C-alpha cells in the first residue's frame, strides 16, 4: 500500500474553501426561532391596527388580505392566521413595514410632547405676560397680539377669582391652532 502525500488535498480542483466571498454564516436554530417569533409579533401588531393605520403601511396585496382575514376571525383560526402572516413576513423585506409602524407609534408620543410644550408656553404667558407674548410672536408671526393679551388678562382674572380656567383653555387651543397651521 502506498502512502498518500500530506498535501494531496491542496490540488483538488474546485476547492474554494479559502474564498472569503463565499463565507458561510452559521445561524443557530434558537436565533432562527427568535427571528420567526419576532416577525409573528410584528404580524400581530399589524393585525391590531385599524384600517386607516394599515393604509399608511406599505403592504403588498397578499399580506394585506391575510391581515384583514386575521382581523375577522377569532380564537384558534386567528392564531394559525398569525403564524401564516409571520411566515409571509419572513419572505419579505420588513424594514419599510417596521419604519412605517414606528412612525405611527411615535406620532402619539410627538403629540404628547407638543402638548406639554404648549401647556408650558400657556403657563408662561399667564405668569410673564408681554415678555412671553413677544416670544410667541417670534415663534408664530401670524399670531394675534391683541387676542393673546385679552386671553391672558381674562385668565389672570379667573385665577385670582378662583373661577374655572376657561381662558387658559382658550389660550391652549389658540396655541395649538398656531402650531398646527405652522406644520
UniProtKB/Swiss-Prot annotation:
One of its GO terms (molecular function) is ribosome binding. One of its GO terms (cellular component) is cytosol. PANTHER family: UPF0307 PROTEIN YJGA. It is found in: Cytoplasm. Pfam families: DarP. GO terms for biological process: assembly of large subunit precursor of preribosome. Belongs to the DarP family. The keyword rRNA-binding applies. Member of a network of 50S ribosomal subunit biogenesis factors which assembles along the 30S-50S interface, preventing incorrect 23S rRNA structures from forming. Promotes peptidyl transferase center (PTC) maturation. Keywords: Cytoplasm, Ribosome biogenesis, RNA-binding, rRNA-binding. This is Dual-action ribosomal maturation protein DarP. It comes from Salmonella arizonae (strain ATCC BAA-731 / CDC346-86 / RSK2980). Transmembrane segments: none annotated. The keyword Aminoacyl-tRNA synthetase does not apply.
Amino acid at each position: 500500500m502506498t502512502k498518500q502525500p500530506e498535501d494531496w488535498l491542496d490540488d483538488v480542483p474546485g476547492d474554494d474553501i479559502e474564498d472569503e466571498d463565499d463565507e458561510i454564516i452559521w445561524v443557530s436554530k434558537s436565533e432562527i426561532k427568535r427571528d420567526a417569533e419576532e416577525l409573528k409579533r410584528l404580524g400581530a401588531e399589524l393585525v391590531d391596527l385599524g384600517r386607516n393605520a394599515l393604509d399608511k403601511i406599505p403592504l403588498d396585496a397578499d399580506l394585506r388580505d391575510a391581515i384583514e382575514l386575521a382581523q375577522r376571525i377569532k380564537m384558534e383560526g386567528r392564531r394559525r392566521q398569525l403564524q401564516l402572516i409571520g411566515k409571509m413576513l419572513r419572505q419579505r423585506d420588513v424594514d419599510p413595514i417596521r419604519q412605517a409602524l414606528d412612525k405611527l407609534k411615535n406620532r402619539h408620543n410627538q403629540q404628547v410632547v407638543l402638548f406639554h410644550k404648549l401647556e408650558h408656553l400657556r403657563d408662561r404667558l399667564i405668569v410673564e405676560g408681554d415678555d412671553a407674548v413677544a416670544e410667541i410672536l417670534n415663534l408664530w408671526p401670524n399670531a394675534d397680539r391683541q387676542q393673546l393679551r385679552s386671553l391672558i388678562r381674562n385668565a389672570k382674572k379667573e385665577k385670582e377669582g378662583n373661577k374655572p380656567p376657561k381662558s387658559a383653555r382658550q389660550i391652549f387651543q389658540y396655541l395649538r391652532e398656531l402650531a398646527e397651521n405652522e406644520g
